[in-house]
Amino acid sequence: MTGMTTDADLRELTVGTGAGGEQLGTDMVLNIGPQHPSTHGVLRLRLVLDGERVVSAEPVVGYMHRGAEKLFEVRDYRQIIVLANRHDWLSAFANELGVVLAVERLLGMEVPERATWLRMALAELNRVLNHLMFLGSYPLEIGAITPMFYAFRERETLQTALEEVSGGRIHYMFNRVGGLKEEVPAGWTGRARAAIGEVRRSLPDLDNLIRRNEIFLARTVGVGVLSAAQAAAYGASGPVARASGLDLDLRRDEPYLAYDQLDVPVVTRTAGDCHSRFEVLLDQVYVSLDLAEQCLDRVDRLTGPINTRLPKVLKAPEGHTYAWTENPLGINGYYLVSRGEKTPWRLKLRTASYANVQALATLLPGCLVPDLVAILGSMFFVVGDIDK
């Protein structure tokens, strides 16, 4: 050894930087997911961090893509209902409903009035079940365990009612083109009304536990603020958009089924932060319980069939139509194109979760890493609904 420095000694070699290597040396690139306990499915977030502050965020979707839209093209109009309720497993009844509404619109079919009101009652109960899941899981994600038990207690009460009428706990498959699968069991509306009353009496336990909890407020108030302009730009809808001040609800503004015969209160907030999104979801539960009860009252006063007799092979006429519904997580759209065959030529889904999750690219930059999961959970999405 001579102690002399050669050109070879001065050469620098960077090994294994992978994706995002250009930021190494100043910022850190961090991947959240695709497997992560705070997501309903497999979502990946590619983050660039400066210390504990997020500089940029990119939601990477597609890990749960199962080709639902392509599968629709090789299933007849009865079989697609089986697929329709699986991309958002927390809103199964609402997803079935959107598909059959599109088919019925293309067929020019009038659905029996009793079936219409039963659909509305079941859709509102399904909305409550969806919201209760997030009302329990969201506090859990930021460290509050107890609300989960209260939320699941109320879910089980309503889940029993829906299981009795449809036979399914998650995938109901109760909608049919032209109505519903079958008549509800004798006395079911009374039992469903009793379940609604029980949930309404018990819900304040969850409400009082978490809404004004000091620690919960500290973690959510002023965190992850999404302005009304940003929500509109991303096409956000549902509780996420209404928490930012977008007063939009299809049940009131573009009514389908018989929602035009109901007074539908629309729950909104203006702060656009995590706490506002949680409050909108919580207050919507009270509204949906009231709406479901009104629908059941109407069902009890109606007689007549629950569905429409269909031909053995159902073919929609050539043409196209678009139906949209106010799903629990936001606006879902169904664009149906038919060539006069027994299967759809194309059925395009517009899902609320896909639009809402895009806002993370705006929400996350500037936040601290500890707030990241609080913001992520408050967007209330299902990854199957994103990836389809």
Curated annotation (Swiss-Prot):
Protein name as it appears in the record: NADH-quinone oxidoreductase subunit D 2
The UniProt entry, under InterPro entries, shows: NADH_Q_OxRdtase_suD, NADH_UbQ_OxRdtase_49kDa_CS, NDH1_su_D/H, NiFe-Hase_large
Keywords in alphabetical order, please: Cell membrane, Membrane, NAD, Quinone, Translocase, Transport
Q: How does it assemble?
A: NDH-1 is composed of 14 different subunits. Subunits NuoB, C, D, E, F, and G constitute the peripheral sector of the complex.
Tell me the superkingdom of the source: Bacteria
Stated family: Belongs to the complex I 49 kDa subunit family.
Reactions accelerated catalytically = a quinone + NADH + 5 H(+)(in) = a quinol + NAD(+) + 4 H(+)(out)
Protein function: NDH-1 shuttles electrons from NADH, via FMN and iron-sulfur (Fe-S) centers, to quinones in the respiratory chain. The immediate electron acceptor for the enzyme in this species is believed to be a menaquinone. Couples the redox reaction to proton translocation (for every two electrons transferred, four hydrogen ions are translocated across the cytoplasmic membrane), and thus conserves the redox energy in a proton gradient.
**EC number(s) on file:** 7.1.1.-
Q: Which GO terms describe its molecular function?
A: NAD binding; NADH:ubiquinone reductase (non-electrogenic) activity; quinone binding
Q: How does it sit in the membrane?
A: Peripheral membrane protein
What lineage is this protein's organism placed in? Bacteria, Bacillati, Actinomycetota, Actinomycetes, Micromonosporales
| Gene3D superfamilies noted in UniProt | Cytochrome-c3 Hydrogenase, chain B (1.10.645.10)
Q: What is its main location?
A: membrane
- Top enzyme class, one word, equals translocase
Q: Where in the cell is it found?
A: Cell membrane
Record-level GO cellular component terms: plasma membrane
